[in-house]
Amino acid sequence: MRHYEIVLLIHPDQSEQVPAMLERYKGMITAGGGTVHRVEDWGRRQLVYLIQKLAKAHYLCINIEASQAVMEEIEHAFKFNDAVLRHLTVVKKKAETGPSLMMRNVEREEARKTQQQEFAA
């Protein structure tokens, strides 16, 4: 089995359905004998260019270990899910379990916002 990193861009109107989508994809992976090493919800972020006339999307990053058959099934599910605007799958040499650079940036932004709110109060 190989290690993969999957980045998903979800339609911003479907943000409340992200946990259910994650559970469905995790179920597909574990049913096929794979494992989920890391799931990061990067939140709603600005897109560099418009996709389907949308300026924002909900970003997800999932690191998994799965067989090729499971990956084909998951990518097939991504293609036929209208909420998934884009997806990118990258093969990794080893499992990534620590927080990614993007997640550290998201955490820094959230900490800065809470500090600003405390100073304003």
Curated annotation (Swiss-Prot):
Protein function: Binds together with bS18 to 16S ribosomal RNA.
Database matches in InterPro entries: Ribosomal_bS6, Ribosomal_bS6_sf, Ribosomal_S6_plastid/chlpt, Transl_elong_EF1B/ribsomal_bS6
Gene3D superfamilies: 3.30.70.60
Composition-biased stretches (Basic and acidic residues): 105-115
HAMAP family named in the record: Ribosomal_bS6
GO molecular function terms attached to this record: small ribosomal subunit rRNA binding; structural constituent of ribosome
Pfam family, one: Ribosomal_S6
Name of protein: Small ribosomal subunit protein bS6
GO terms for cellular component: cytosolic small ribosomal subunit
Annotated spans, Disordered: 99-121
Entry's family note: Belongs to the bacterial ribosomal protein bS6 family.
TM spans (from-to): none
GO process annotations (BP): translation
Keyword Nucleotidyltransferase: no
Native organism: Polaromonas naphthalenivorans (strain CJ2)
UniProt entry keywords in alphabetical sequence: Ribonucleoprotein, Ribosomal protein, RNA-binding, rRNA-binding
